[in-house]
Amino acid sequence: MLTIKPLAAAILIVISFQAFAEMNSAEIQQVGTNNTGSLEQQGSGNYAYLQQDSQENSQAEIFQNGTSNSASVYQLQGSDNNADITQQGNSNNAAIRISENRSGSIFGSGVSSYQEGNANTLDITVTSYAAGVTMSSVGDNNSIRGEVTGGVSGAMLNQVGNNNGIDVNLGSSSYASVSQTGNNNTASVSGSSYRMGNNSTELTQNGDGNHASTYMGSQFGKVTLTQDGLGNQADIYSSGRSTTISGSTVGNNNTVNIDQSVETGSAIFAQSGDGNILNISQQALLTTSL
């Protein structure tokens, strides 16, 4: 007969509590440089909040495993920082905010987030200069929203699953790579205003019944779209000067609409399959030099 001593029993109770804890809340606030904040939660209905102010070379990490959890990271008035959120489970929510100080000196921040499960949401806002952003989700009915508006930044967004959505907005001279694998997904990418330029977007969808839309409002912008599957739709709009649109669709019953209101723009697109539709409209945009 196995006998459990009181100390061993207490340890087992603690381990069990940690593994199945629910409705916990944890908050970390740090001010200064070279800080590291880390939170880990197991269970459901948990809340994690990590804020770092006036910092440089700081690290913020949150890991949650369970359902209906919420995680937030705020990094304010600093530079060369990194923020990372990982969530595993369903119906989780993650938010990251990286903002500049009044002098706009924040730059070089790194942001990453990964979600695995269904019905999760991810919301990232980065106003820092020269930021690198990576957002990924695996599962169904997930949503990713990104505001990367600081300029000269790069965003990589990836989703695997069905009925997922991506919505990203770029600042000037920035790059976005969007990839979706699955069915009935939507992806939307918008660029900056006309006087800011050199934005580039690459959008790839593999699956059926997907919809991609992109608006490029900058000069010298570039859009590349690839869709592989059945019954997909793409809507591409660009305005400004010297914008380039290219891409291809492979499969049947796909529709592509391209609208360019530009100076010296170009559109090169190819389709392979049956019952496809390709519409290209180009209109000269007259500008006045100031």
Indicate residue ranges for each PLM-predicted region.
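Bacterial N-terminal signal peptides that target proteins for export
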Residues: M1-L7
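N-terminal signal peptide c-region/cleavage motif recognized by signal peptidases
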Residues: S16-Q18
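Low-complexity repeat regions of mature extracellularly deployed or surface/particle-associated proteins
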Residues: E22-L290
